[in-house]
Amino acid sequence: MSTSPTISFIGAGNMASAIIGGMLDSGFKAANIWVSAPDDNHLQSIRKQFGVSVTTDNRYCAEQADMVVLAVKPQVMASVCSDIAPVVQNTRPLMVSIAAGLEASTLDEWLGGGLPLVRVMPNTPS
């Protein structure tokens, strides 16, 4: 028996959209994807484009997930991490960061420590 994990994206920019599109193209179910961002109008566009669940509440988004993809700009990462830290410390999802220039040890500290954490550097064609 294999079930798809629920993956939440904190951040809904170009890179998150590209990853979501690729996941859906490869057969991942939209019902297992959550996306959060501060701009509800942009989120509604993402919902219409991909059929995923959306929210402006980062904590709620993180709470839904088996895996959380941190897809925000490096300059807001500390704030986002401290906001969701109480939730992810409780639920213990796999944390994945696609932000450039931030060390895993820094992310680990901001998230409260001890979570499974992966840094990746995705690249999309120009």
Task: Tell where the protein language model's regions lie, with residue ranges.
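Rossmann-like NAD(P)(H) cofactor-binding subdomain of soluble oxidoreductases
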Residues: 50, 58-70, 74-126
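NAD(P)+-binding Rossmann beta1-loop-alpha1 motif at the extreme N-terminus of oxidoreductases
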Residues: 1-56, 60-63
